[in-house]
Amino acid sequence: VTRIQTTTAGSLPRTTALIEANAARTFADDGFTLQSTPEFERLVAGAVAEVAERQRRAGVTLVGDGEFGKAMSNPVDYGAWWSYSFQRANGLSLTEVNALNEPPVRSEPANLRLTSFLDRRDRQLFPAVYAEAVELGRVATAFPTTTGPISYRGHDAVASDIRHLKAALLEGEQGFLTAIAPGSAARVRNEYYASDEEHVWAWADALREEYQAISDAGLIVQLDDPSLAENFDQINPEPSVSDYQAFTEVRVAAINHAIRGLPKEQVRLHLCWGSWHGPHATDIELRHILPVVLEANVGSISFEAGNVRHEHEFTVWGEVDLPDDLVLAPGVVSHATNVVEHPDLVSQRIERFADIVGPDRVVASTDCGLGGRVHPDIAWAKLEALGEGARRAATRC
């Protein structure tokens, strides 16, 4: 019987102690860099060891650190995967106008630019829903702006992430750490570089140091890049597919620049449409972006395949030319609903992809991070359903 491997998209529920400890941390003089202490580091190390063991018990075979090194000071937080990067880059400072409150921007054909977060098209289509029902939580720090040259300063922080995860792994066990991709990091407001494209490339050069550190440690680095799909919603008015593909090709080229020379099998790309609980009616279809995404020189791709907006798109993977060595990590349990998936549904979802690439090239995963998006008890029940579904699929593939 083939064993179906399992993993997660990264974020897992933080413990109450970890959330409270993050909330109690002080800021450096810049107003957004969180200070660390030896006591805090010990708390994180212990929490990572526990979350790794809990993943194993649930049936996860490729574990991560739950993103516990990325600060969450509130139980509901959709942004820790991004806001952690502010702690790890030079060239940022707090300004009156930032990515969250900047004025709207209008794009023109062949000249696409991201508009403000408040001007996103799904939000404009459903203003009452976003005003009343879409909870986005709070991130642990304020949003800075690029006001100088971007460079990497996260060496100690990524070394801590690596140390904590490696200490939590069993002998010979592989693990992964997440890191933001250049295109997503560059969505902070740019007041320094001559163009948005230059801004993306600057982040690529800086973040390469983080990817290299994780890879050199023998771990898998997962590049979180919701921007590849999600930017479509942040361009107003809606762009043509060809213009959006050209816009996205720059972001994929920046990924390839940043991961050049790293072992392909140690690089995983996470593609998603944003994990907030909104209508997502303006999400771009997978078939329009997959050919561009497949230009990324990565060993595996993690993506949403377990929610009502994107589950039907599993067929697209069978309609494109996939590299023979590309591993697919489809989301088969989702952050998008409180309903816990039945293991037989999980198994069916896995089997669809096994039919396309073979069971040895499928690693069953979560759609997106679960931490900060669903109640912790639901998150762990979903991971148990993931583990059981993978066991059932193994008997059928």
Where are the regions a protein language model picked out?
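Domain-level signal for soluble alpha/beta catalytic cores
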Residues: 1-397
